[in-house]
Each structure stands twice: as C-alpha cells, then as structure tokens.
Amino acid sequence: MTESAAPSPRCVAAILLAGGRGLRAGFGRPKQLEWLCGKPVLRWSLDVLAGYPGLSGGVLVANHDVMAATYPLPEGWMAADPGVERQQSVANALSALTDWPDDAVVLVHDAARPGVDSAVVDRLLAALDGADAAIPVLPVPDTLVEAADGAAGAVVARDRLARVQTPQAFRLGTLRRAHAEASGAAATDDAQLVRSLGVSVATVEGDARLHKLTYAADMAILAGLLGTKDMMRTAVGMGYDVHRLVEGKPLWIGGIEIAHSHGLEGHSDADVGLHALTDAILGALGDGDIGDHFPPSDPQWRGAASHHFLSFAGERVAANGGRIGHLDLTIIAEAPRIGPHRVAIRDRIAEILAIPAGRVSVKATTTERLGFTGRREGIAAQAVATIQLPET
C-alpha cells in the first residue's frame, strides 16, 4: 500500500473497489479490465471520480494485474491491496486515508458499476449536509416472491423495498467506526455496517446506468445504458529481431525452451520471437522500442526472461486504453524445426498477454539456405501487431 497523502481543504475522497475476481462473469480475467464502449470497465468509474471537481483524492483498491493496467493513477490517488472480502478491501483503503480528518467525506464505489456520473455524486454530497451517510437507491419494478425448493411462495410487498447502488457517501469518521466495530461481520455494502451503529442512512435518487456488471450478459445491458459507441482507431506496428547462435546455450523462442545444440546469444535470454513482438506492440503505440525501455547497458536485464518485456508492452497497451487485436509472428530459421512447437509458442504468447490464443498467429520459414540464417549462424523473427486505441 502506498503512503497516505495529505487531504486538501475540501476533504472529499473516493474509494474505488476493483479487487474482485469476477468469476461469475466468466471472462477469464478480471472483469474490471473488460472492454466497454471504448475503454476498460474500470476506467469509466476512475475517470468520472478523478475528474469530479470537488474531489481531493482517492484510493484504488486492486490487485497487481489491474493496477498495472491502470498505471499511472490520477494525481492525488493512492493504491491499496484488496482483501479476501469486500469489507477488508474497504478497511485497507481506509488505512491509506489515515491523515484525513473524521469530518471528511468519502465516497465508496464498486468499479463493477461503470455508469457513475457527477449528478449522483452531487445528490449524495448534498444529502450529507444533514446526515452521516447517504446511498443511491432505485425502486423495485418487479413482483417479488419468496422462493424455495423450486416453488413460488408469498408475494413480498415491494413498496417499502429499494435497490441499493454505489457510490455511497459517508462521513469518514462514521465509516471508520463502523469498520472498527464490524467484528468480522459479513456485509454486502458499507451502509449495512453504518446502520449497525444506529446511524441513520439517507437515500437519494439512484441511476439506472449504475447497473452492476455481474454476468457476461450485463455487458450488453451496460453498453445500451451508457449509450456510447466504440470510438477506436486501429494502429499497426512491426518488429524485427535477430540473434547469433552459439554452442552450449539454452534456446528460447516464443517464450518456450526448445531442445537444440545451440542457443541464442544476447544481453537477456535473446528470445527473438518475444523481442520482435515487443517491438511490434511498442511500435503500434508509438512508444519507442525494447531498447528504450530495457537498455542492454542496464545490468538488471542481463539474462532476463523476455516474457517480462512482452508483458510490459501489453500493460502499456492497456494503460493507453487500448487492446490487442492480433499478433502475427514469423520465425526465420534453418534449424531447429519450429513447426512442432508452433502451438506451444502461440499458447505461451497468449498466456503472457492474457489474450485469447485465436488472436495470435505463429509461422516459421527458412531462407532456402541463403544468408546468415541459411548458414545456421543465427535466427531472426519478424512480427506485426494490430491494436485498437481510443480516438484522441
């Protein structure tokens, strides 16, 4: 967790919870990083909250993968580690706000509700003029029944029920006390903990656009609610790398080790495939090349595994609000034969970048015994990366 930052005089902070695993959504990666109408789900909430005029700072609670894809954080924001449960994640964020006074206001919001806007925040802050806590709610439109063993029971009166959303607003001291006295109670939101103190929680009008992303089908619902079309441009980058073959070294190509009498010589593990892909992605971003970010003059990269370089390039795509559309890698070698390893290489590249294997193509060719590759002096690789980036 980063050190606490001193608050500004207005003392309004946000806690953005993005530490959930999202298993029910079934995306194969954190749902906060899924693409929604032109940018990752997490970015919808982060951009609105960080841009809110009355906000003095914030805490993003997220695991390493999500944090790396979101770097750099907005000015005034800090990072905190997630807990096993939501309640612990909020407690970790509160620890990052140690220097903030009890009369400060804190907004607690779930990143899985990307439709937050300034209007609902305005209503919440206004409600705190006469309360220690406020939450957005919507009426329940459906008929509700008790259900058990596959049978419908009595109808539940809905006129006294409401759907609770986030963000939720609290006086910081009240929320601190609620978490301190929670004693491990499992609460689904922070208002539940605050109510256990006997504190009245005000309600304000919610927003249908604060629909929660829980299942994969919710993506289509949110896309319709947010009413924004993808405004993306396609960028293409090319990469090329070559290394000399030397006897007695391990041979790494495309992130896997291949049994061979010779290996590639270089400052790192000399993986020509991953180096070419890294340069192709960085080229599409207009973000220099592998030597700019991992200079061979830097001893920390001596013997380094090249998957670190490719992973970095993928994180840079995400940090720029982009996504990898397709990668095409060609290995140029007389020996060893690459064909038997193509699937393993493809799958390893997809694993490193956390993208579907169908977005990766791996091919191999020779130079018909011509040139340095034909003489088995070295191996070359060339790559093309196609990525989508937000229009600027």
From Swiss-Prot:
Q: Could you say which residues are annotated as the site Transition state stabilizer? A: R24, K31, H267, T366
Entries under Pfam families matching the protein = IspD, YgbB
Q: Give the span(s) annotated as 2-C-methyl-D-erythritol 4-phosphate cytidylyltransferase.
A: 1-234, 1-235
Q: Which residues form a coiled coil?
A: none
For the site Positions MEP for the nucleophilic attack, which positions are given? R158, K212
Q: Which Gene3D superfamilies does the UniProt record give?
A: 2-C-methyl-D-erythritol 2,4-cyclodiphosphate synthase, Spore Coat Polysaccharide Biosynthesis Protein SpsA, Chain A
**What cofactors does this protein use?**
a divalent metal cation
Which cysteines bridge via disulfide bonds? none
Binding site residues for 4-CDP-2-C-methyl-D-erythritol 2-phosphate: D241, V242, H243, H267, S268, D289, I290, G291, T365, T366, T367, E368, F372, R375
Reactions mediated catalytically: 2-C-methyl-D-erythritol 4-phosphate + CTP + H(+) = 4-CDP-2-C-methyl-D-erythritol + diphosphate; 4-CDP-2-C-methyl-D-erythritol 2-phosphate = 2-C-methyl-D-erythritol 2,4-cyclic diphosphate + CMP
PROSITE patterns documented for this protein: ISPD (PS01295), ISPF (PS01350)
**What highest taxon heads this organism's lineage?**
Bacteria
- Keyword annotations from UniProtKB, A to Z: Isoprene biosynthesis, Lyase, Metal-binding, Multifunctional enzyme, Nucleotidyltransferase, Transferase
Task performed by this protein:
Bifunctional enzyme that catalyzes the formation of 4-diphosphocytidyl-2-C-methyl-D-erythritol from CTP and 2-C-methyl-D-erythritol 4-phosphate (MEP) (IspD), and catalyzes the conversion of 4-diphosphocytidyl-2-C-methyl-D-erythritol 2-phosphate (CDP-ME2P) to 2-C-methyl-D-erythritol 2,4-cyclodiphosphate (ME-CPP) with a corresponding release of cytidine 5-monophosphate (CMP) (IspF).
Instruction: State the family named in the UniProt similarity comment for this chain.
Output: In the N-terminal section; belongs to the IspD/TarI cytidylyltransferase family. IspD subfamily. In the C-terminal section; belongs to the IspF family.
**What name does the UniProt record give this protein?**
Bifunctional enzyme IspD/IspF
Q: Which organism is it from?
A: Sphingopyxis alaskensis (strain DSM 13593 / LMG 18877 / RB2256)
